[in-house]
Amino acid sequence: MRPLDQCQSIDEAWVAVLQAAHHEAHGRLLHVVVAIDAPGPPMPELVALNDELLQQSGHHCVDRVASTVFPSSSYADPGLTFDPDMPAESLAILDSAEQDLYSRYRTMLPQLQTFDGNSHGTYFGRLVSWPGKDGDGYNQLEVRVRQLRGRRRRKWSSTNAADMTTDDPVWSGGLREYDAQDERPFGFPCLVHIDISVVNNRLSLLAVYRNWYLIEKAYGNLIGLTRLHHFLAQQTGYELGELMVHATVADAQQHAITKVAVAALLDRANEQLAARPGRETAANGVAVTRELSSSSHGRIPAGTSR
């Protein structure tokens, strides 16, 4: 296993994993673990760098990859965070935004599956309509939100905020992305599981990838996971915790992209990281969810299944 240093941002995390893999003889790492303290919006400069290389190699852009994990274009952020004592009118607005996201995506899922690479479904489709074959499946994400809200309500009514974790310090639950009975030798979803844990009132995510393609997918994956993370924090009222990714194999794609091109990308990315100004992060989901979300709500979220 290769645990990397704790990162402050998804930008640092992406560059750190790519750099570590690039320095390996074959450009691949086994069992990489990277953690981000404060997952927030990506650096536009790094998105542009990644997009430039993706366009040259004929791959989907970063935002399209991110939309497969969380389609921000389909979520009309209400600018509210769940609280057990929030007014009924505000709760109704928050609930409406959540339900609109689910219904909009589930309605579009059959059409999305006709797009290139989506024949076996999309990541977000499996979250809101398991197993993701159509729009009538089991909504894992909605169930987890309701469970977490119920947890917040019970703790709020029985203890004060300072004592919330005294009786039961850890609550965890997962979101499935992979069917264990799926015997396809190829075409597996690379993202197989998302674990949700609450410790000390902080909601953290762990995403498990079988194969993590560091040029083609990883940065977009991190952006999408961050959007999902902030959505969960906003809809449940928990503080934003750590985002962690465990990749069975992390691949710098030096054979497909070329080692020279990856090295050039890393040089430019490290320059951008070194030159960036201080970047603020939000204590909960609201501020960053707005920045992470697209302004064009309602359009079909393009994406591929991996």
Predicted regions: what they are:
Residues 1-306:
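Terminal, non-catalytic protein-protein interaction segments that mediate quaternary/complex assembly
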